[in-house]
Amino acid sequence: MTIKRGWTKVGLVLALTIAPVPAMAQGLGLNASDGEAFLNAVKEGDANKALELANQPGSRVANYRGYKGDTALHIVTRKRELQWVGFLLNKGADPNIGDSNGDTPLIIAAGIGFEEAAAYMLAKGAKVDAINRRGETALAVAVQQRQPRLVELLLKAGANPDKADRVSGYSPRDYAKRDTRNPQILRLIETIKPTKKAVSGPVIN
């Protein structure tokens, strides 16, 4: 991860310990120019600028959705930038906001095998059974993308393996049964019990 203007990785790690601010409703009352500036700062790894904008009184830039539908948390999750994921969550980024496809950052993390980020999002209130526009949960995506570690993490967090999507009508368990080349995923679904109650509900689009 590139960090500009004299920041070190240690400095950014220290910034992650700042107490989080409450997550706000996506997009409401946000200054678009500040929001776009924040997204650009995050994309460019400019920690000083990101902090400057996020620390403004009443700032809600952490939940600003850009013109393509992404929040900063979507962007850094796709780029697998764990330090930025932590920074944004500690600045009040809502892990339940969907992008233009309805994918939450957790769904994205599940699809690419970004286990550390997924665990942090769940700890910060990500809804494990939130769905995208196709009706897919993070677990369904993890099963389809053959991500056993994410499947295990999500099941332990209470993900429902029998929640069918809207497109095929298949559930994560159904997808796992059809994937005969990867029987370990079905074994996980059949054996792992949740260690905490699942949080479900609609995403913010």
Please give the residue ranges for each predicted region.
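Bacterial N-terminal signal peptides that target proteins for export
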Residues: 2-11
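Start-of-repeat signature of ankyrin repeats
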Residues: 34, 69, 102, 135, ...
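Ankyrin-repeat boundary/linker signal
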Residues: 65, 98, 131, 164-165
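Ankyrin-repeat-protein effector appendages
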Residues: 2, 25-40, 157, 167-168, ...
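Ankyrin repeat A-helix N-terminal signature
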Residues: 40-45, 75-81, 108-114, 141-147, ...
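Ankyrin repeat structural motif
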Residues: 46-55, 81-89, 114-122, 147-155, ...
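Bacterial N-terminal signal peptides
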Residues: 11-19
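Ankyrin-repeat inter-repeat connecting loop/turn
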Residues: 60-62, 95, 128, 161
